[in-house]
Structures are given as C-alpha cells and as structure tokens.
From Swiss-Prot:
Protein name: Endothelin-2
Propiece span(s): 27-46, 70-178
GO cellular component: extracellular space
Record bears the keyword Signal: yes
Pfam families according to UniProt: Endothelin
Family designation: Belongs to the endothelin/sarafotoxin family.
GO molecular function: endothelin B receptor binding; hormone activity
Keywords for the protein's UniProt record, in alphabetical order: Cleavage on pair of basic residues, Disulfide bond, Secreted, Signal, Vasoactive, Vasoconstrictor
Signal peptide as annotated in the record: 1-26
Organism: Felis catus
PROSITE patterns registered for this protein in UniProt: ENDOTHELIN
Subcellular location: Secreted
Annotated spans, Endothelin-like: 96-111
Upper classification of the organism: Eukaryota, Metazoa, Chordata, Craniata, Vertebrata
Length: 178
C-alpha cells in the first residue's frame, strides 16, 4: 500500500500534467462537436496572410504572427513555420494574400508594389550645364578651390587636435622621477 503523502503527491502531479496539456486549448462549446484527435494534434498558427514566396523574409515576418526569429551569423532564420507550401506560387502577381479582407494594414502591405531600384543609365541624366535642382555646375577651377579649402580645413583640424592632446598629457619634472 502506498503511503498517504505519496498518494497525494501522485494525484497532484497527475492533475498538474493534465492541466498543463490543456493549457493552450479553448474549451469546446456544448453546441459544437469536439475536434478530432488529428485536428487537436496539429497546431494552427495564427497568420495574417499567406506569402507568395518563403524567401521574402519581410513578408514572412509580417504575415506569421507567432514565429520565433533566430539570428544566425549567415542569415536570419524563421523557426516554427512548418513545411513549405507544396504548390508553386510564382503565378501570383501579389506579394501575399490576406486572411481577412477587412485588414487594411495587410491589404496595404500585400498589394503594394515594391519600389524599383534606382538605375542610372549613362547619358540619361541632366544636361551637363545644369546640376539637379537648377544649380549651375561649378567650373573646374571652383571645384579645385573647394577641394583645397576642404584639405586645408582638415589639416588645420588635425593640428589643433594634436595640440589639445599634448596639453592634456601630464608633464613630469625630473625630481618626480628620482
């Protein structure tokens, strides 16, 4: 026969384990049938939307609400996403599909077009005599003078910094060294 304190500890431990297993599940309402064992075994992750590509890290981070991001030296890896989708989604024109049509932040994120990279094509810039905001380009002499002024200012600053460092150093007389 089991001693009385050991029996109470066993019952308390069994109750604790039973409560811990059901901690994350919502109780079934009396009018709804209880989910099957297979449905309970799979964890449904809350997600805002479904990304067209698993390589789009910004989309995956935005859409999947409870993933854990682990920083590794080479890349940022999402854990907890499950298996990648079985079908190819290259035909989708959008970045992702929202779970709810009433989520304006998701609609804005998924349906906006990525900003194209700025590509500079030689010869497609402004005319040589006008520089961007209507300012005339400086002549070669003016540009050379500006570079000389910058160089002189840098050397003057370096000299002042050396003097300041020398003044901060303590000077020791010979009698302190004896």
């Amino acid at each position: 026969m089991v001693a009385m304190p050991t029996a109470w500890c066993s019952i308390a431990l069994a109750l604790l384990l039973a409560l811990h297993e059901g901690k994350g599940q919502v109780a079934a309402a009396p009018d709804q049938p209880a989910p099957s064992h297979r449905a309970r075994a799979s964890h449904l992750r809350p997600r805002r939307c479904s990304c067209s590509s698993w390589l789009d890290k910004e989309c995956v981070y935005f859409c999947h609400l409870d993933i854990i991001w682990v920083n590794t030296p080479g890349q940022t890896a999402p854990y907890g996403l499950g298996n990648p989708p079985r079908r190819r989604r290259r035909s989708l024109p959008k970045r992702c599909e929202c779970s709810s049509g009433r989520d304006p932040a998701c609609a804005t994120f998924c349906h906006r077009r990525p900003k194209p990279e700025a590509v500079v094509v030689p010869g497609s810039g402004p005319p040589p005599d006008v520089f961007q905001a209507g300012r005339a380009r400086p002549s070669a002499g003016e540009l050379l003078q500006q570079l000389r002024d910058i160089s002189a200012a840098k050397s003057h600053f370096a000299r002042r910094q050396q003097v300041a460092v020398r003044e901060l150093r303590p000077t020791h007389s010979r009698r302190w060294k004896r």
